[in-house]
Amino acid sequence: MTQKKPIIGITPSHNTENNDTSLRPTYPKAIAAAGGLPILLPLECSDEDIKQFMDVCDGFLFTGGPDINPFLFGEDTHLKCGNISAARDHLEFRLLSAAMDAGKPIFGICRGVQVLNVGL
């Protein structure tokens, strides 16, 4: 019998200039190479969707990308901040809270570590 692969939910990048979401192919490739089954999470989802992700996913990868909104950690937006996505911030902070409550493993890369730092 084949062992069930862990399902890993991956947060998408969001380009606010054209409202595109994307994912670097290296993220799902790395998860698959480690024996996981990667799935891309939608940028916009309800609280019910977040709850369902907790039932479906065994862990979560918070990917790299532009900075989170400095307002979320009590700072003003610096002129050098680019492409701040309120939609991505909203998804990732709700997802982080739910994953922590559910005891799910979380891994952050670059921006993902910023989310963990601010969210915890």
Placement of each model-derived feature along the sequence:
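Catalytic nucleophile loop
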Residues: 113
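N-terminal beta1-alpha1 cap of cysteine-dependent amidohydrolase-like domains
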Residues: 1-109, 117-119
